[in-house]
Amino acid sequence: MEIGTLVRFRHPLVRSAVYRSAALPDRQAVHLVLAEVTDRDLDPDRRAWHLAAAAAGPDEGVAAELERSAGRAQARGGMAAAAAFLQRAVALTAEPGPRAGRALAAAYASLQAGAFDAALELAATAEAGPLDDLQRARVGLLRGQVALFASAGGEAPALLLQAARQLEPLDGGLARQTYLDAWTAAVFAGQFAHAGNVREVSLAARSAPPAPDPPAPYDLLLDGVAVLGTDGRAAAAPMLCRAARVFAEGEIAVEEGLRWGWAAALGACVLWDVESWQSLVLRQVQSAREAGLLGQLMLYVHALGTIAAWCGDFAAAASLIAEGDAIAEATGTRVAPFAAVVLAGLRGSEAEATQLIEAVTKDARAAGQGLGVQFCHGCRQSCATVSAATTGPCRRPGRPASRRPTCIPRRGRFPS
């Protein structure tokens, strides 16, 4: 170790070992000194963090500084950094009211960062405090969103539908947003939805408070998917096309695009609007990466991998699938690997595709993801058709199926 104007350690692990071996009062004293010598105006966030580490108990002043710093921390280190500041603010807050409000804010930040267990723990902390009706409805909404993003299983539609109904008299706009989340959850859950299938959610959404004039992007999308779920594709097509264009190309806030872009992508997919589907998903992947929102990034990366496979860019598809799998492992998320099934089938790897279909079907059933089961059923039929075509009399001897041309258009490179 060298001590001068800076303290230098021979290896970063030595620094960690020294820090962790120090007694708690010594660490707190050092953090307090560092806070005192850190400029309040030039680096308020670092100062707040050192003050928090130096605190021996609740401190409302430090908690308020951490809360103010959370937004700046997000800009530098992503949503996980913002969640860390807010969680520490909760720990330093003694008054029940402010503690509950900060816990709810920290829970939503943790949800967006993909820390689902932490989000639920913080929601429980918030629920134990004196919340008003809107805050309690938002706790229910958070639980539904965790169920959607963590597993997309059968529990999520009912939770989100209940939250939407609770929100109607409290916040009409948020209620409409929640109906859109519930519709997405119902599509994923399919036949495994405990309650709140696509038609039920669509009917409830059509009776929700009307959209403002002019409507927000999510209002256009909700009206389109609600008609899709009740009256069918032909009736919904004009509204879904308009919504898809707005989400793919329009002026839309990053938060809005990430939250409801998946539903817009489903609408474009239902209409086989591949151009809007690709543009929309690519835009959301880029936004989620920049914002560090791992929960949403995992879904969009897998979707982009599927599109890349359909468009013939198998290398990009494989890279995107690997990235999505890594995110899923890091966040503890279980989502059926649709993209891997599509890639194996389009490569002509019949044995691999069949094995994946069986594994994905089993996992999708266990997770309550009806969309995954339905998707695999369609892939199994497609594989049977491809197998019959590739083993018939028209197949050229010695030419592997994976190298025969397909009718899938190549629409350009996909970022990995």
Model-predicted segments: where are they?
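Amphipathic alpha-helical repeat scaffolds of TPR domains
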Residues: 45, 136-140, 174-187, 214-226, ...
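Short coil/turn linking the two alpha-helices of tandem helical-hairpin repeats
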Residues: 55, 144, 151, 183, ...
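Short secondary-structure boundary elements
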Residues: 1-98
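Alpha-helical transmembrane segments and their interfaces in multipass membrane proteins
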Residues: 248-251
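Short, polar/flexible loop-turn hinges at active-site or ligand-entry regions and domain interfaces
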Residues: 21-23, 150-151, 167-172, 190-193
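Acyl-donor-binding surface of acyltransferase catalytic domains
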Residues: 179, 183-188, 194-203
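Helix-coil-helix junctions within alpha-helical repeat/solenoid scaffolds
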Residues: 64, 69-70, 80, 84-98, ...
